[in-house]
From Swiss-Prot:
Mg(2+) binds at residues 7, 56. InterPro entries: 4-PPantetheinyl_Trfase_dom, 4-PPantetheinyl_Trfase_dom_sf, ACPS, Ppantetheine-prot_Trfase_dom. Its EC number is 2.7.8.7. Transfers the 4'-phosphopantetheine moiety from coenzyme A to a Ser of acyl-carrier-protein. It comes from Leptospira biflexa serovar Patoc (strain Patoc 1 / ATCC 23582 / Paris). GO terms for molecular function: holo-[acyl-carrier-protein] synthase activity; magnesium ion binding. This is Holo-[acyl-carrier-protein] synthase. Keywords: Cytoplasm, Fatty acid biosynthesis, Fatty acid metabolism, Lipid biosynthesis, Lipid metabolism, Magnesium, Metal-binding, Transferase. NCBIfam families: acpS, pantethn_trn. Its cofactor is Mg(2+). Signal peptide: none annotated. The lineage of its organism: Bacteria, Pseudomonadati, Spirochaetota, Spirochaetia, Leptospirales. One of its GO terms (biological process) is fatty acid biosynthetic process. Belongs to the P-Pant transferase superfamily. AcpS family.
Amino acid sequence: MLSVGNDIVENERIRELLQKHGDRFLKRVFTDDEVEYCHKHKDPVPFLAGRFACKEAVIKALNLEPGQVADMREIELAGTNFGKKTLVIHGKTEKFFREKGFTGSSVSISHADHYSTAVVVFFKEPK
């Protein structure tokens, strides 16, 4: 069985949230490792936007209601620029993932001038 979620984020929206809320926004949405990774780039905004889109895509793939994910930091994307991205799910969100019987995931993130997008696929390994 597969479950797919996708999301698209306007990069400027993330830039505005950063300007308005600064570290408070970062600490509420991203893990320390995600923030560190994104800030290694000349412009961290597209990378933050891609990770934000990934988190939203996870929520859609799990078919969760907005209030069911208490902490966006429970959804973490680890990986390098061109290497494989690894989705790490913690806490309550991981519980939903396991309860639905999923055993693995695949993630793809893309950036364009004004938008970042993510697609997440959850799957169950055949027995």
